[in-house]
Amino acid sequence: VPARDIYYYLTLSTIPIMILWVSVIIAQAGGNPFSALRDANVAEVRGIRTAAFFVLFWMVSYIMELQVVSRENIRRVIVLFIANFFYAFVSMGKMNFMILFLATAIILTERKIIRIWHLIIAFFVLLVFFVGVQKMRGSYTNPRHFTALYLTTSLANLDQNVEPSTAELPAENSCRLFYAIKSSLDGGETPVVDPILEFQWVKIGDLKYYSNTYTTVYPFYKDFGLIGVVGFAFMLGLIFGYLFKTAEDGSQFSLVLYAILAGTVVMQFIGDTFFMVLSQNLQYLFAALLPYIISKYNLFANTFARNG
């Protein structure tokens, strides 16, 4: 299938670029190299930002190969898994590990290759990874503290520190993408909300935590109050309901996109990872849709036939 080949060889050709970037960042890191890698994932460090557009194709390529995993393509699957794991590691981003874990679990469950007890074991392994990533970044190292921070503080943080309908600009959180586009066009004059939210103290019983998670309703609640929460919840329900239904009906495109975006559903108790990073999700949409356009219209078929 030409589309799968194109994505696979695109991945192979861009892995050396990522390795070079990571080598430069680590070589020039003044302190904690893992912290420097994290900084390079969310903003440029000496002109380098590891959150490159091409890594989206790595994930889509991995899922497409995993959908048809067999003895014939198992090497590809392993190479692509290692590539995506490598990126998740060097990005020092827990969400990237989550996407890789969930995408793998969803596809293998759909293929009836793994069972529930496999998922339970994998979940605890993922939790260990999360604690390890947090420790390497120089943040919280206590597993109990880490678990409590992410499982208990979000709702309390929303209740204690966020007032409804208090956004400085209309829909600046829910429609962040439009402000980002406007900012890029006017030379940065339009302010854009940082998707990494502000840390604030949260009191739970006699304990206090320093947290920047507010559950998935934060952008809608802050922009529009309870009406926004209801409206955007309905919108998300339609989107994910459609993807799930069409994936169940056999749409491979919907299955790929659902596998990638499933983290949005799982992470709702922590924060919104759909609308506030809509630009990235639209790029995933493009990367997931392109192979099926290539296959449907036999794009590049003549090129592969000549080279074959």
Enumerate the predicted regions with their spans.
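Membrane-embedded catalytic interface detector for glycan/lipid assembly enzymes
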Residues: 1-114, 127-141, 305
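Alpha-helical transmembrane segments
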Residues: 6-13, 50-54, 76, 119-123, ...
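Small-residue-enriched transmembrane helix-hairpin modules in multi-pass membrane proteins
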Residues: 36-44, 129-241
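Central hydrophobic cores of alpha-helical transmembrane segments
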Residues: 76-86, 119-127, 237, 255-264
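Hydrophobic alpha-helical membrane segments of integral membrane proteins
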Residues: 94-102, 117-120, 231-232, 278
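Short alpha-helical linear motifs
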Residues: 104, 123-126, 142-148, 255-260, ...
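Juxtamembrane/interface motifs at transmembrane-helix termini
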Residues: 118-120, 136-139, 250-253
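Hydrophobic alpha-helical segments
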Residues: 209-308
